[in-house]
């Protein structure tokens, strides 16, 4: 029987162990997509408790706690103490066995705090106090955590109207780790509620200094903000979409639709889809002009629980995997940009694992030989960000594309304790490839090439792909 979470955790063969310890583990971290709060990095935030750094904003844990019968006030309540919330989480942890939360929890305790104990109600107080004592030390600040995990670059997720003041402050402070913005313009194409859209466009006008009364004005304002993001080191965009939009439309139609929604009138379903289709193309062209990488996270059904959405807002644990037939629209959208000669580097993330092979084969349609892996299959996202999901994503990519050109892992997280997800990914990768070597499916004579592939997927591919 193997020990739980020892140095060879998840590494089932000798080859896997060598690949991880001698190659993957030595690589720095490039976290090219995350949801860290930039101000916390700029101010080098000090965490007052383990609850703040671990449970604050973590909808994965909240979902598990609710499922375990924990009252909402212990998840998101304002009048509940940090200890009370942590105690309820500790009571829940033993019930998360076989859920990735069980592994993440103990990997984070071990790598951040040097704690090998299993978290449960009996150990909760001891672990809580020990972690809180360490969090009071300077090296456990926000920046300290990033240094601890040898982070080299992080890319936050930012709206076009953001001032990026905290990115600027961080850079000017001389902090050695790069914190770069990512362009996330979802609100500029969210035309379902006219009043919300108009309020956003008015904010865009204020920030850009461009008076907006037409569609062309809006695009000019967005381009000005896009230029500003580029000046601040932005290399990527990101789009959170239910599905791909690729309706046929004319420029005149889009201008009319803009006037209608900006004037406060509700759009038809057809008009909404046409507008979103046009905006995806506009954004794609902007990114191409600057050599950015565009990312698409698609396939989530969000805010399913109306009651809790009204109470807590979005991103609080009430989203799930959607079922959309989007392959044709995805193809049409990519082809539309490619036909114009304006298809930039692209990463596609699916939330429904049924689409793994769809994406893995879609990539090959638009690789053009200009750079290795120009169109990428993103690492297992959200509900798929776990051992089984990672393996399935990498197996599909291996069978139908080139795993060796994969840009690898990202945290997609709001937490400064989530960097061990890179370790979890690297161990899973090394175990997958190591088994192939041991089984004679990859020649041991090519072990130097295998070693390099592991280092590339862990670090070098991303560094080159994003020009960091």
Predicted regions and their residues:
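Residue-level detector of anion-binding/catalytic polar loops
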Residues: 293
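Catalytic core of soluble alpha/beta enzymes
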Residues: 245-260, 278, 296, 300-344, ...
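Metal-cofactor-binding active-site regions of metalloenzymes
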Residues: 2-290, 342-344, 348-353, 360, ...
């Amino acid at each position: 029987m193997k020990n739980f979470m020892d140095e060879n955790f998840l590494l089932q063969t000798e080859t896997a162990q060598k690949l991880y310890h001698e190659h993957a583990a030595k690589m720095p971290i490039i976290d090219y997509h995350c949801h860290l709060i930039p101000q916390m990095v700029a101010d080098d935030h000090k965490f007052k408790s383990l609850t703040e750094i671990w449970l604050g904003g973590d909808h994965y844990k909240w979902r598990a706690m609710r499922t375990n019968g924990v009252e909402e006030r212990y998840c998101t309540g304002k009048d509940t103490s940090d200890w009370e919330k942590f105690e309820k989480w500790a009571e829940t942890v033993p019930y998360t066995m076989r859920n990735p939360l069980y592994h993440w929890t103990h990997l984070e305790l071990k790598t951040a705090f040097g704690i090998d104990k299993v978290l449960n109600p009996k150990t909760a107080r001891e672990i809580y106090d020990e972690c809180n004592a360490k969090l009071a030390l300077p090296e456990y600040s926000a920046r300290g955590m990033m240094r601890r995990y040898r982070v080299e670059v992080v890319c936050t997720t930012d709206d076009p109207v953001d001032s990026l003041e905290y990115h600027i402050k961080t850079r000017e402070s001389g902090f050695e780790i790069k914190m770069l913005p990512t362009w996330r313009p979802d609100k500029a194409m969210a035309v379902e509620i006219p009043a919300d859209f108009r309020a956003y466009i008015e904010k865009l006008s204020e920030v850009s200094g461009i008076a907006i009364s037409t569609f062309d004005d809006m695009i000019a304002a967005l381009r000005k903000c896009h230029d500003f993001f580029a000046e601040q080191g932005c290399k990527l965009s990101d789009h959170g979409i239910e599905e791909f939009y690729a309706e046929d439309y004319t420029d005149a139609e889009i201008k009319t639709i803009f006037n209608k929604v900006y004037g406060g009138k509700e759009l038809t379903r057809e008009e909404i889809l046409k507008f979103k289709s046009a905006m995806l193309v506009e954004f794609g062209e902007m990114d191409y002009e600057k050599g950015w990488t565009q990312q698409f996270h698609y396939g989530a059904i969000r805010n399913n629980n109306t009651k809790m959405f009204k109470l807590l807002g979005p991103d609080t644990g009430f989203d799930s995997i959607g079922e959309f037939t989007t392959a044709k629209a995805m193809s049409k959208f990519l082809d539309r940009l490619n036909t114009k000669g304006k298809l930039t580097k692209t990463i596609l993330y699916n939330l429904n694992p049924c689409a793994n092979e769809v994406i893995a084969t879609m990539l090959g349609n638009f690789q053009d030989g200009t750079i290795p892996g120009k169109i990428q299959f993103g690492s297992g996202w959200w509900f798929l960000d776990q051992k089984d999901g990672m393996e399935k994503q990498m197996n599909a990519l291996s069978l139908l594309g080139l795993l060796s050109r994969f840009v690898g892992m990202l945290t997609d997280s709001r937490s400064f304790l989530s960097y061990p997800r890179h370790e979890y990914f690297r161990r899973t990768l090394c175990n997958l490839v190591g088994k192939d070597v041991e089984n004679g499916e990859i020649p041991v004579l090519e072990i130097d090439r295998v070693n390099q592939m592991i280092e590339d997927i862990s670090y070098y591919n991303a560094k080159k792909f994003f020009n960091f």
